[in-house]
From Swiss-Prot:
Swiss-Prot/TrEMBL GO biological process terms: inositol phosphate biosynthetic process; phosphatidylinositol-mediated signaling; phospholipid catabolic process; protein localization to kinetochore; signal transduction involved in filamentous growth
Record's function text: The production of the second messenger molecules diacylglycerol (DAG) and inositol 1,4,5-trisphosphate (IP3) is mediated by activated phosphatidylinositol-specific phospholipase C enzymes. Required for cell growth, osmoresistance and expression of GPD1.
Residues that hold substrate according to the record: K518, K520, S614, R643
Transmembrane segments: none
Name of the featured protein: 1-phosphatidylinositol 4,5-bisphosphate phosphodiesterase 1
Region listing for Disordered, in residue ranges: 546-571
PANTHER family from the UniProt entry: 1-PHOSPHATIDYLINOSITOL 4,5-BISPHOSPHATE PHOSPHODIESTERASE BETA-4, PHOSPHOINOSITIDE-SPECIFIC PHOSPHOLIPASE C FAMILY PROTEIN
Active site, renumbered: H395, H439
Bias type Low complexity, positions: 558-568
Gene (UniProt): PLC1
Listed EC numbers: 3.1.4.11
An example Gene Ontology CC term for this record: chromosome, centromeric region
Keywords: Calcium, Hydrolase, Lipid degradation, Lipid metabolism, Metal-binding, Transducer
Reactions the enzyme catalyzes: a 1,2-diacyl-sn-glycero-3-phospho-(1D-myo-inositol-4,5-bisphosphate) + H2O = 1D-myo-inositol 1,4,5-trisphosphate + a 1,2-diacyl-sn-glycerol + H(+)
Length: 869
């Protein structure tokens, strides 16, 4: 029995079960029919094939055309999301109702489920409905809606409790188990829809339906856009024309049909080039494509000339297949893989022709697509003291936007921890009912306990290595006691104290699944060692200038009627905070790292093993410019910890260039993760390296410093000798990168300047700590500066544009060198990626591309070839 026949029988059985379960609803309507593809997809993935049962099924065939054709009539609607979200893997695995299929659940939600929408101001009943044609959930009579493709995560149970306390502190206990928080994005801003179901059945139905649809729409994009040519053609034909094999010869597609189909599935080719492909496939020359001609059209469309060139290099005529010996040679000479023959054979077997001992071009292309592009790190590299590592660090973690008047949110902590951040910041202030977390600039606040619970939940979701919490204590002694009690109770055995250890800091491997608090020492502990300091050393020095602004705001607000409610008054109280916040023993005793006020590097407090200086970017930049201070800074950071954070004038949460601070050996270079500018892209690239962990964890958040930054010295004057030694032992490095092509390039939106323009080029930027020994050059493009160049424009093809341009640059070394690729059309950036150069594997690699918000496109990649000579 053929696979397609089995699929048909699977569907028939599914359809029969579905009809049986819905008998009381009468005849299945066209709206029901529109959901058949949902039932088929979900059932196909879970059904164990039973041919005997299948043969007894009905002869009803599935019809998925209706949903796609109705969707095709909506010009702004595509078939699924373009990008992945950081929490998508956890999201799509949520499934509570197993007693019925997704199609049945969706029918219920189409009719509407009555629930309570929760906001900080009110609780109100609404009927929530699914509009299946364009993937929306609507309420408030359709005036409010949520796009399923914009959903980033769904929180229930413990993960939703933090939102419950934030939105409705006086909620009923019975609400907690029925609360659903949907995190989604609108205009690049995260929002949350909080709903409470009226009963467990509605809760399970709504949750299972939303999670199932989000998962299905993502899989739809993956399965339709990425299969082999024949499968690709069949899926698109069935969606657009007919599912019946007997119709393949008589049904046809016009050029207008093909153009609409391409647009719907993010296939952007100029009208002229698309017409050329259409005419090449139109063997009958009748202006229409039957199925076999359409299959040829897909083959022409997806033909990759750049891969053909690689293929012909290793398969000399008359051979049309790749032998194992040639494949092994390709791995060693082109890919620079350090593999033995046994490992190479395992790759070869996976991608070879099913019945032969050779590899075809389709298998070879698939191999190229699926090969990793980043190097891996072994766990033994995490055995050195903490001060030997760069640590992924966040500034103002609780903010999702600019600093002034921005509402704090636990979502900030969830997002950075999902991305591998290992040092988060908590600003603790006095609240009406205990310690709260906020920025202090007339913002609302989150209960500290809520934040600590979220951190505990997500602390090790991505990385098993230690998490550092940088505490900014701005509250009175009573709230400090409460804060220490909260952290002891919630974090419990995960808290780590350095104690009396004086020789060296523990390693990341020793501290797996541990949490270290960083706070200022008590005034008693620092008395006699330093002058009185009104704020914790880790407290942002920006407060001094900001406090003056806040006091003026306080004076202006005293007579304002807008500050009459208790929440606003509490914000004013925080502004009038006294200029002194002594740290009590309760907080200091549970801290593993102690922040101290920086005066100079020679005092006794600068030599305690667990101390940490916390300085703003300008103070460190000043040190770097001074010859003697620069050496002292370098010497300190070889043995002790330091944290650098953005200056107060970055009120829009922009980021600095982190490279000079890494070059100075600073471990915790804290950036605003909520802003995806070049500073944050460099920061993410530094910690993008994958870990070879048994549990599959990745993005450890710890990167071993370059070797020249590791040797501990007793005298600062020894440091130049270290650098001289490493420079003498290494030659300049020439980097050659051939930019070949991109695949499935997306279009920004319908109103973008490149709406009807499929011409694009790639801009390349090298970001490094030193001037290049030899500036950048490019063979098919334009040099912009010593470190920047751009390719020529690829005309007419936005689906798989080819550039085949090589850039070359010579550098002193690659320890702190990053490369950024940007795909640009009509001066509009479509996609980009930033990589640390020495993480990049050699040879041919497909690099995933990201949108302007830093989210990875599901199907868009950049194909390059890299050599380091």
């Amino acid at each position: 029995m053929t696979e397609s026949a089995i699929d048909d029988q699977r569907f028939n059985l599914t359809k029969e079960l579905q009809r049986h379960s819905c008998r009381d609803q009468g005849k299945i309507t066209q709206k029901d029919d529109a959901l058949d593809f949902i039932s088929y997809s979900s059932f196909q993935s879970s059904f164990n094939t039973d041919q005997k049962s299948a043969n007894n099924g009905s002869t009803v065939r599935r019809s998925i055309r209706s949903i796609f054709r109705r969707a095709a009539e909506l010009p702004r609607v595509h078939m699924g999301p373009l990008t992945y979200s950081h929490g998508i893997n956890e999201l799509v695995n949520k499934k509570l109702r197993k007693d019925c299929d997704l199609s049945t659940l969706c029918r219920v939600l189409q009719r509407g489920i009555r629930m309570i929408r929760m906001t900080r101001r009110r609780r109100k009943f609404y009927e929530f409905k699914l509009i299946n044609n364009n993937g929306q959930i609507i309420w408030k009579d359709g005036s409010k809606y949520l796009e399923l493709d914009s959903v980033k995560d769904i929180r229930i149970g413990d993960t939703a409790s933090t939102y419950q306390e934030e939105v409705d502190p006086k909620r009923l206990r019975s609400d907690s188990k029925l609360w659903i928080a949907i995190i989604y994005k609108v205009s690049n801003k995260l929002k949350a829809l909080h709903v409470v179901a009226l009963n467990e059945l509605d809760f399970n139905t709504f949750l299972s339906c939303i999670c199932g649809l989000v998962k299905l729409r993502r899989e739809l994009m993956e399965s339709i856009l990425l299969p082999d040519n024949s499968q690709f053609a069949r899926i698109h034909w069935q969606i657009t024309v007919s599912e019946k094999e007997e119709d393949e010869k008589k049904d046809t597609l016009s050029f207008a049909d093909v153009k609409k189909l391409c647009d719907k599935f993010h296939i952007y080719v100029s009208t002229g080039q698309l017409l050329e492909f259409f005419q090449l496939a139109d063997i009958n020359h009748n202006g229409l494509l039957n199925y076999f001609e359409f299959e040829k059209f897909i083959k022409i469309l997806k033909n990759r000339k750049e891969v053909n060139m690689i293929w012909s290099k290793f398969t000399k005529p008359p051979h049309s297949h790749l032998s194992f010996e040639n494949f092994f040679q390709f791995l060693i000479t082109e890919q620079h893989e350090q593999v033995d023959r046994q490992t190479a054979w395992s790759y070869f077997i996976k991608y070879r022709e099913p019945t032969q001992l050779t590899m075809g071009q389709d298998g070879f292309t698939k191999f190229l697509k699926e090969q990793p592009y980043l190097v891996e790190v072994k766990e033994e590299l995490y055995s050195k003291p903490l001060n030997h590592y760069f640590i992924a660090s966040s500034h103002n973690t609780y903010l999702l936007g600019k600093q002034i008047a921005e509402t704090p949110s636990v979502e900030g902590y969830i997002q950075v921890l999902q991305q591998g951040c290992r040092c988060v910041e908590i600003d603790i202030w006095d609240g009406e009912n205990g310690p709260v977390v906020c920025h202090g600039f007339l913002t609302s606040a989150i209960p500290l306990k809520t934040v600590i619970r979220v951190i505990k939940k997500y602390a090790f979701i991505t990385s098993p290595y230690p998490l550092i919490i940088s505490l900014e204590i701005n509250c009175n002694k009573d709230n400090q006691k409460l804060a220490s009690l909260i952290m002891r109770e919630v974090l419990a055995e995960q808290l780590y104290f350095v104690g009396t250890r004086t020789d060296k800091l523990p390693s990341p491997r020793e501290l797996k699944h541990k949490i270290l608090l960083k706070s200022k020492k008590t005034s008693e502990a620092t008395r006699g060692l330093s002058v009185n300091e009104p704020f914790p050393s880790s407290f942002s020095s920006s407060y001094e200038s900001a406090n003056e602004q806040e006091l003026r705001m306080k004076d202006d607000s005293t007579n304002s009627s807008s500050a009459t409610n208790s929440s606003s008054m509490q914000r004013i109280k925080r502004i009038g905070l006294k200029k002194h916040a002594d740290i009590i023993n309760d907080v200091s005793n549970i801290s593993g790292i102690h922040g101290i006020k920086f005066r100079n590097f020679s005092l006794p407090e600068s030599k305690t093993i667990a101390h940490c200086f916390s300085l703003n970017e300008r103070k460190v930049e000043y040190m770097i410019k001074d010859k003697h201070l620069k050496l002292s800074l370098d010497k300190h950071n070889r043995r002790y910890l330091m944290r650098v954070y953005p200056h107060v004038l970055r009120y829009k949460s922009s980021n600095f260039n982190p490279i000079p601070f890494w070059k100075a050996g600073v471990q915790m270079v804290a950036t605003n993760w909520q802003t995806n500018d070049i500073g944050q892209q460099l920061n993410l690239a530094m910690f993008q390296i994958l870990d070879h962990q048994p549990d599959g964890s990745f993005k450890s958040g710890y990167v071993l410093k370059p070797k020249k930054l590791l040797p501990v010295v007793t005298k600062a004057k020894m440091i130049p000798l270290i650098y001289e030694h490493f420079e003498n032992g290494s030659d300049p490095v020439t980097v050659k990168i051939r930019i070949l092509s991109t695949q499935l390039l997306p279009r920004l939106n319908d109103t973008s300047p490149s709406r009807n323009n499929t011409n694009s080029f790639v801009k390349v930027e090298f970001h490094t700590d030193d001037e290049p020994t030899m500036p950048i050059s490019i063979d098919k493009g334009t040099r912009i500066s010593a470190t920047e160049a751009s390719t020529k424009s690829s005309q007419g093809n936005g689906f798989n544009p080819i550039w085949d341009a090589e850039v070359s640059i010579t550098l002193k070394d690659t320890d702190l060198t990053f490369i950024k690729f940007m795909v640009i059309s009509e001066e509009t950036q479509i996609a980009s990626v930033c990589l640390k150069l020495n993480y990049l594997r050699m040879g041919y690699r497909h690099i995933p591309l990201f949108n302007m918000e830093g989210e990875q496109y599901i199907f868009c990649t950049l194909f390059i070839h890299t050599q380091i000579l």
